Amino acid sequence: MMNEALKKLEELLDKDQFEKIKAINNPYLHSFLAEWIQWLEPSKVYVCTDSEEDEEYVRWKALYYGEERMLEMVRHTVHYDNYYDQARDKQNTKLLVPKGTNLPFLNTMDREDGLREIREIMKGIMRGKELFIGFFVLGPKNSVFTIPAVQLTDSAYVMHSEFLLYRKGYEEFKRLGPTKNFLKFVHSAGELDERKTSKNLDKRRIYIDLVDETVYSANTQYGGNVIGLKKLAFRLTIQRAVREGWLSEHMFLMRVNGPNGRKTYFTGAYPSMCGKTSTAMIPWENIVGDDLVFIKNLDGVARAVNVEIGVFGIIEGINQKDDPIIWQVLHSPVEIIFSNVLVKDGKPYWNGMGIEIPDEGENHSGKWWRGKRDAEGKEIPPSHKNARFTVRLEAFPNLDREALENPCGVEVGGMIFGGRDPDTWPPVRESFNWDHGVITMGAALESETTAATLGKEGVRAFNPMSILDFLSVHIGDYLRNYLEFGRKLKKTPKIFAVNYFLRENGQWLNEKLDKAVWLKWMELRVHNDVGAIETPIGYIPRYEDLKVLFRQVLNKDYSREDYEKQFKIRVPELLAKIDRIWKIYEPIDNIPEELFQELEKERKRILEAREKYGDYISPFALEK
């Protein structure tokens, strides 16, 4: 017998589209779709299966509706967002929680109020528009990591982006049958202006219902606000991971190639502008993913998968010299959506690309010319600093394809936390153990704000595990889950911290590619192939080992003087950091006691070393 929701869907959909939904035996899905199709009132509905025809239909519709335009290179298109819709809207992104829920640092709203408001905004918002329904999975299909998700959107650009970024999941939904275990995303770009960008930005809302695992976004097109399975799903999967005892992390996943063909996998969490992409893209190593991972305990071993199969990357500053692989991908005839870049004669241009940029063209502000100013009198650059490219990982020659598709994931040899400061953390170090690494490296992560982030330059932004913007649970619960996850493993990944941004007298102490050496050292440490120097803050490399690696990896000399400058233990700065981190956590209830214990032990070790060696300690003094 057909359930009520299915009957309703039969009325609402064309026969072909209805048959696609009917083939999925899931009454929970049927009632969700029936409710929202009625509420949104689209004039047409298209259901995407896993077929190439459906993907082609979406590509065509993105062009037909004017949300994307073709560029000169085959398979390349450009999309523009509203001039004032160019980044994640933190103010209007809210977690909907039951009354009385307290989540420090997070932007929350009473669930009943939030649902009432978003429903009001979205009532009939798709009149005269086409609704696309897409099915996807996070993580590999048919695996212990798989999380199914359904996306409703009136933007062909959003659906096109998700086809590039995620594994298709229609067949997976059919296989799973009547499960409630799927994530739900409802998006409308709202009314569009003549450039086909969202018009009613005053009604822009991104509401994340943590109870029903559903995200609603309205009157916005910027990827971070609307690509449901990206950072919106991330908040839902963090909550799920903490509840179920695994990790959902804002990390790259890469393979570092060791001696004799050995493959070692690392995850890495770095706040923006801290070197995450450039680390994951070192030409002679291999990428598995650049942004989001799931890590689970399988038979006592931490194993990780890339949640995605594509890259939604910042294009600013990508140039041939520093980013040869990405540059090559962006100039090859693979399917790419460029967003908010300058276009002239069908070619895309962006800030910092290292070649001459035309003096006029079209960009996110419309018709553009050099010196053009916006309504606030600010000069408009050729491309927006948050301009993006969306492309499948299979386009990258350095992709580790086997690791990307392995349903069991890959063993995590090491986890890297990458901060940014001019004077505190050494370039690379290893923690004493899991708890020490989680607390003094991950939970204490800071990045000095740069010109590229809003706010004052030179301020240290606290960003534990680089996850603060996306956290959806109490930070104490999140950290407790992290600590417990490691304790349950038979084989614990090593934890490392890196900092590529040390300065002395205004000069950088490291060159851009030095990070390639730190990776090789970490790979050797995972397998205990080299020794290390014990310091109050963890293990650092020995000069002799780095000297060999600099010659092997970069074919250059590495002086004792450089080593000493980079790896000296900076006592006053390290103590100041412990005080800063302590003060942030101290007023918050429900923080694991281990956090304060680890910080106190670290402080004690640093003070003891100061007694013996003074404020600035040469690594040679500590070498036993």
Curated annotation (Swiss-Prot):
One of its GO terms (biological process) is response to starvation. Keywords: Cytoplasm, Decarboxylase, Gluconeogenesis, GTP-binding, Lyase, Manganese, Metal-binding, Nucleotide-binding. One of its GO terms (molecular function) is manganese ion binding. Disulfide bonds: none annotated. Substrate binds at residues 88, 222-224, 272, 386-388. It is an enzyme of class 4 (lyase). Pfam families: PEPCK_GTP, PEPCK_N. One of its GO terms (cellular component) is cytosol. InterPro entries: PEP_carboxykin_GTP_CS, PEP_carboxykinase_C, PEP_carboxykinase_GTP, PEP_carboxykinase_GTP_C, PEP_carboxykinase_GTP_N, PEP_carboxykinase_N. GTP binds at residues 273-278, 388, 420. Catalyzes the conversion of oxaloacetate (OAA) to phosphoenolpyruvate (PEP), the rate-limiting step in the metabolic pathway that produces glucose from lactate and other precursors derived from the citric acid cycle. This is Phosphoenolpyruvate carboxykinase [GTP]. It comes from Pyrococcus furiosus (strain ATCC 43587 / DSM 3638 / JCM 8422 / Vc1). The lineage of its organism: Archaea, Methanobacteriati, Methanobacteriota, Thermococci, Thermococcales.
